[in-house]
Amino acid sequence: MTNKNAYAQSGVDVEAGYEVVERIKKHVARTERAGVMGALGGFGGMFDLSQTGVKEPVLISGTDGVGTKLMLAIQYDKHDTIGQDCVAMCVNDIVAAGAEPLYFLDYIATGKNEPAKLEQVVAGVAEGCVQSGAALIGGETAEMPGMYGEDDYDLAGFAVGVAEKSEIIDGSKVAEGDVLLGLTSSGIHSNGYSLVRRVFADYTGEEVLPELEGKKLKEVLLEPTRIYVKALLPLIKEKLVHGIAHITGGGFIENVPRMFADDLAAEIEEDKIPVLPIFKALEKYGHIKHQEMFEIFNMGLGMILAVAPENVDRVKELLDEPVYEVGRIVKKENESVLIK
């Protein structure tokens, strides 16, 4: 018995692993940008920081996954957008700190290497990288029989970006009177899916609920997370934004306070939030308390910006998309977020 046969008999298909690498090369090539050094397949991805032209570079990194949204991708056998979700969760976090994404790495663990399926996953990762301007410079695909079921996989990612030291957004400039501007989300994004799956556990995904404006439930649930990088970078370069909150797990209540000091609070006017139909459906069919929705989901706004009043018009001009003025920064009395 050769080592190869022994490994195959233990459930690891080395040849399938090689096929995955060949299949994903064309997708990785889409993500090339200035600064990338070396080719896919080396022991480490390389990037020449001097190519960015940043005078006082600060590296900002982030890592994340997509939670149990993956279980819906597996259930519905749709794998071509979940990679974009993974990239979005990482790059949206680092752009909130003022970083331009430079490169990305992914990690996929699976019970059985299925090259066609894994190519779809990486194609989604590459699409997310293209949308955010990050190069996909490396990754790992681990076949782990016994750890995962044959149809199961997990996905995580790692993003590294750069910011000028003077352009870092750490919340220290957020001040009383700053205006809170919201940018629309594409849907649920990639958090709260354990609850989402419970609410719709008895649904096939083919249903067209009256709240969903003609779309199938599975299409809405797997709508990829919006990537905000290209919208926000011009604002960061002009130093127009005092704070940025990426509205992910914990919704408004947990994430908005992360962009300002402890003596401040966010006063938000609920009637100015463009609540998406899926959130109305979740609240209705899940019998979820209205206030709790804001503790879990983005409700239709994936990014909240704190902007000085005199800069609001310029920010809206640069964004060239619907921007929602949803509240202001006030002195803290009790709660960090007040939804009125």
From Swiss-Prot:
Keyword check for rRNA processing: no
Keywords per UniProt: ATP-binding, Cytoplasm, Ligase, Nucleotide-binding, Purine biosynthesis
Keyword Membrane: no
Compartments where located: Cytoplasm
Gene Ontology annotations of biological process type: 'de novo' IMP biosynthetic process; adenine biosynthetic process
Top EC group: ligase
Principal place of residence: cytoplasm
InterPro entries on file: PurM-like_C_dom (IPR010918), PurM-like_C_sf (IPR036676), PurM-like_N (IPR016188), PurM-like_N_sf (IPR036921), PurM_cligase (IPR004733)
Pfam family, one: AIRS_C
Xref: SUPFAM superfamilies: PurM C-terminal domain-like, PurM N-terminal domain-like
Source organism superkingdom: Bacteria
Family label: Belongs to the AIR synthase family.
HAMAP family according to UniProt: AIRS
Annotated protein name in UniProt: Phosphoribosylformylglycinamidine cyclo-ligase
Source species: Streptococcus sanguinis (strain SK36)
Lineage of producing organism: Bacteria, Bacillati, Bacillota, Bacilli, Lactobacillales
Gene name of this polypeptide: purM
